[in-house]
Amino acid sequence: MTAAVAQQASPSSRTAVSKLALRARAGLPIATAALTLLAIGIWLVTGASELLEYRRGAIASGEFWRAITGHLTHWNADHLLWDAVMFAVLGALVERTSRRAFLATCAVSAAAISATLWFCRPGLELYRGLSGIDSALFVFQAGWLVREALRERRCVAALLPTVALAGFAAKIGYELATGATLFVDSAAAGFAPLPLAHVIGAAVGLLTLGAFVRKLGASANQDHMHQQRRRFQELLFTKCDAN
């Protein structure tokens, strides 16, 4: 199917698709695996979560790393299970499309969520969890699938990720309205859900997807210009040889 589409596409589109195919075959999603194992390791090591969690007072005292590492800490095994499984699956999908896009989405969403909590939730002392970053990865991957399906005029294929995005928006709406989570029993775990982190994560996923698509388009245009220049040079040399 991919080969058939590539043959019908323009040279620049074929080049862009070929680059993505090469990246997809580059190997296992190592960064995703490493971060997932790191989150599990932090949970298993006694005292690590307390040292790395988002703790407002400690950050104010200069422990700035907590703003990033806090996303790798969790409240209980159930919380870790849901977050880590979603991160592993979504991260692997995004990383196989582009490792740079995966790392950028994780880094920007982690920083943006912590900054938002710092400025908009000054009364929040503690925060843990990968769910905000999971939200960013989900929106990136679902949006990418929609974009690719529409680019190839496969409207039916675009339906499922579109429905998934709508369901995700409904989930966030439910969390905002009820203050409860759908998948993790936050009350039993002794922590309060924070839908704001999911909203910020989703926004970051959309922004990083847009940046990735623009960069991909710019790269395709540049490759097309190089091809045109080579063709012109070949034509010029052919005329010179004929003379």
Where are these regions (language model features)?
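Small-polar-interrupted transmembrane alpha-helices in polytopic inner-membrane proteins
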Residues: 29-46, 87-141, 161-173
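Extracytosolic (periplasmic/ER-lumenal) interhelical loops and adjacent juxtamembrane/interface segments
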Residues: 49-76, 175-185
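Membrane-helix boundary/juxtamembrane motif in polytopic membrane proteins
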Residues: 150-165
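Structural signal for the C-terminal ends of transmembrane alpha-helices
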Residues: 45, 92-97, 141-151, 207-216
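Alpha-helical transmembrane segments that form the membrane-embedded catalytic/substrate-binding core
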Residues: 80-87, 128-139, 189-209
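Hydrophobic, membrane-facing alpha-helical anchors
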Residues: 56-60, 76-91, 109-113
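C-terminal transmembrane module of polytopic alpha-helical membrane proteins
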Residues: 1-23, 170-243
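N-terminal membrane topogenic signal
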Residues: 19-33
